[in-house]
UniProtKB/Swiss-Prot annotation:
This is Protein COS12. Residues 92-231, 279-380 are extracellular. Its main location: membrane. Belongs to the DUP/COS family. The chain crosses the membrane at residues 71-91, 232-252, 258-278. It is found in: Membrane. It holds the Pfam family DUP. The lineage of its organism: Eukaryota, Fungi, Dikarya, Ascomycota, Saccharomycotina. It comes from Saccharomyces cerevisiae (strain ATCC 204508 / S288c) (Baker's yeast). Residues 1-70, 253-257 are cytoplasmic. It is a multi-pass membrane protein. GO terms for biological process: protein transport to vacuole involved in ubiquitin-dependent protein catabolic process via the multivesicular body sorting pathway.
């Protein structure tokens, strides 16, 4: 498509006739995601068909008058409901897949970036477009900006990143490749601006990190640090411990070696479970902005050769995550070694090997900055 023709096409988008301020995101209308999801399902054609199916079955039950018949039919109908509920998610993806071009146009027009709030305008406009053109039965297709951003990453960003050299063969409908590439270009440009803003001298505040103590300084050992983290983050551990201690004080027969051994085994399994999954939990607690900030600390922290680089990075990240109220404890990393291992496993390894790991491999937009952080580490 000619460049001038493409720009003219983008300039007159059909969705511009909708005033985004006249539409409201579902997150501001419904009490929760669950109520919105139920509303969407109840207004679907599949659910209404399921309700109509009950009428002949109830009539047949009245004629037969057998109780076991009603039980069998009820169980069967709920199986059908489960199937229709699952199919609704597939139908939603198909609807979005058919409107990839319009979705890309909204991204080009509104230029969203890495912030979730930037995607709310895209969600509002796209919801209105689908409803006004009778492509969706409600005006609440996207729940919020986060769900809209996630759909973009799944429908456009991921296929592009996995098939970068042959994007035309990715799961993108014919005729929409031009809009899709332009939308991705807009998105990457906004992320690049965010990266430069984070790295600017005005944003990188120089906090005093000497007062921030690691586990071996503040708690005596990493074991005590791990125990404290488990108590704070794992509610099951705290609940079980309090419940057993209460029972131990009020019920004398629990004070025997068998019960104590059992409780110790349960508590130990909880600690081991948490310690195994602590890195994954730490990674999932970070959104894209937090990860970008972490990479910025690494890139700027390795500008000069210093044996305490990772310790300073860990302290700054601990302070940042605690101030952002992302981590309940002021200690996210126990020391510099812990911080370095976290970076290598969840950031460096997926990019270097391009492996399909369960976490870390889906943040495709962060790959250039991960490589920049790797380069900074290797230059030391």
């Amino acid at each position: 498509m000619d460049g001038a023709k493409f720009e003219n096409t983008v300039a007159f988008l059909p969705s511009e006739i909708f005033d985004c301020y006249n539409s409201t995101l579902p997150k501001n209308v419904f009490r929760s995601f669950v109520t919105w999801s139920c509303y969407e399902k109840f207004n679907s054609l599949e659910f209404r068909t399921w309700l109509l199916m009950w009428l002949p079955l109830i009539i047949a039950w009245k004629i037969r008058g057998k109780r076991h018949y009603l039980v069998i039919v009820t169980a069967l109908m709920f199986e059908v409901l489960y199937f229709l509920w699952t199919y609704s998610y597939i139908f939603r993806e198909r609807t979005l897949g058919k409107q990839v071009s319009q979705f890309a146009k909204e991204i080009i027009t509104n230029t969203p970036g890495i912030d979730t709030e930037d995607w709310e305008r895209v969600a509002v406009n796209f919801n209105s477009y689908l409803y006004e053109n009778k492509l969706w039965n409600t005006e609440y297709f996207f729940f919020d900006g986060s769900s809209c951003q996630e759909a973009f990453r799944k429908m456009l960003l991921e296929p592009f990143s996995l098939k970068k050299n042959d994007f035309a063969n990715a799961k993108v409908p014919d005729g929409s490749v031009c809009y899709t590439e332009k939308a991705l270009q807009v998105y990457f440009t906004q992320i690049e601006r965010k990266w430069h803003w984070i790295n600017s001298e005005g944003f990188l505040h120089n906090k005093t990190t000497q007062s921030v103590q690691f586990s071996k300084h503040g708690y005596g050992s990493k074991l005590l640090w791990a125990f404290k983290e488990v108590t704070i983050m794992n509610s099951r551990f705290a609940f079980f411990s309090i419940a057993y201690l209460n029972g131990l004080l009020t019920i004398p027969r629990l004070r025997n070696s068998l019960h104590i051994l059992y409780v110790c085994a349960v508590l130990s399994s909880m600690i081991i479970e948490y310690l195994i999954g602590i890195d994954k939990f730490r990674f999932k607690s970070m959104n894209l902005i937090h990860k970008l900030q972490f990479l910025s600390y690494i890139t700027c922290g390795h500008e000069k050769s210093d044996a305490t680089n990772w310790s300073q990075i860990a302290k700054r990240t601990n302070t940042y995550m605690f101030e952002q109220k992302i981590w309940n404890s002021p200690i996210l990393f126990s020391d510099g070694i812990d911080c370095e291992k976290f970076f290598k496993w969840y950031f460096s390894t997926p990019v270097s090997s391009q492996a399909s790991l369960s976490v870390g491999s889906t943040d495709f937009e962060l790959w250039p900055y991960i490589k920049e952080a790797q380069s900074a580490c290797n230059d030391v």
